[in-house]
Swiss-Prot record:
Catalyzes the 2-thiolation of uridine at the wobble position (U34) of tRNA, leading to the formation of s(2)U34. The record marks 126, 345 as: Interaction with tRNA. NCBIfam families: PRK00143.1, trmU. This is tRNA-specific 2-thiouridylase MnmA. Pfam families: tRNA_Me_trans, tRNA_Me_trans_C, tRNA_Me_trans_M. Gene3D superfamilies: Adenine nucleotide alpha hydrolases-like domains (2.30.30.280), HUPs (3.40.50.620), Translation factors (2.40.30.10). One of its GO terms (molecular function) is tRNA binding. The lineage of its organism: Bacteria, Bacillati, Actinomycetota, Actinomycetes, Micrococcales.
Amino acid sequence: MKILAAMSGGVDSAVAAARAVDAGHDVTGVHLALSRMPGTLRTGSRGCCTVEDSMDARRAADLLGIPFYVWDFSERFAADVVDDFVAEYQAGRTPNPCMRCNERIKFAALLEKALDLGFDAVCTGHYADVLPGPDGQPELHRAAAWAKDQSYVLGVLTAEQIAHSYFPLGSTPSKAEVRAEAAARGIQVAQKPDSHDICFIPDGDTRGWLADRVGAEPGDILDGEGNAIGTHQGAAAFTVGQRKGLAIGTPAPDGRPRFVLEIRPKDNTVVVGPQEALAIREIAGSSYTWAGTPPTRPDQPFDCDVQIRAHADPVPARAAVSVVDGSMQLVITPRDPLHGVAPGQTAVVYAGTRVLGQVTIDRTVSAVADARPPVRDAGPADAAPAAAALVGATAGE
């Protein structure tokens, strides 16, 4: 096959490209320039896509003897990932920028350009696997290295995108083996640290970064009855499940600690309550996709596992596509309550190791009655109350 290897400058993508060459494919390397000011995108081991990373990728490509290019995707990345991240937070939702990048950049803009240029597939260093299904169609599966599995952040891929994706690291037992292989091949980045968190916020100060862009306005902290029990200096400074730093002047009647349950940008309030009020018994959303043929017909429930964070444990659940409030939604009911779930997060559904699809969460239903004041759903077009807990996930390579 003619393969376009996306090379981030890290060890995973370098070894993935090397394995593609070993497999006899016609490989070309490409590094994505995602910022016009790449020096701002790294602090120590945090961040990615800097000039240093581009040079590391070029050196790896030269070692492998493959052509190498740098493509400027900075404008598309700013519009589809960074601006989306800010807009979602302003709407009180919890975006996952790594999934947006996979959905709109690596397996959309990059893949589209690759196919236009005659490539058969895009190769990345993600820890996931593409395997043939019973009908011969490619399926997206978890990686053999469960601790490094990145199938969650690839859950946004459609069947067509999966058919043009190549993940050579999928069957690798561990990251240590990848590093050892890189060292044996003479790849200079064999011991380069993994990138973490959000690449365009390399210092990890998401609250400060957001405050610089959306401002910080004081507002009320509410209890479950809607009573104002304190004030905050900016809702973006809080995350769902947070306990420390609430600075509540009125203690709880039962003396128990309180946790952030929701952030409500429409009226600039933060709702707090007991820890058990974080439990969620149902999630749903209208923005869903399937990684192949839908598992059932609409209104026909199916068993699955649901995962709501990149490295969270999957939870057994029942799911169905149903009409809710006039729109088709994927509704998921976990066997046991989920905790700290926020609108804007992504729920990926699995059948064993296979990714079935995903949904962006618009609505959550508390497992605890009367735990919060009345709320409105936070759909994509409505900046309504919602939680704003940031879910960090490594971006993959």
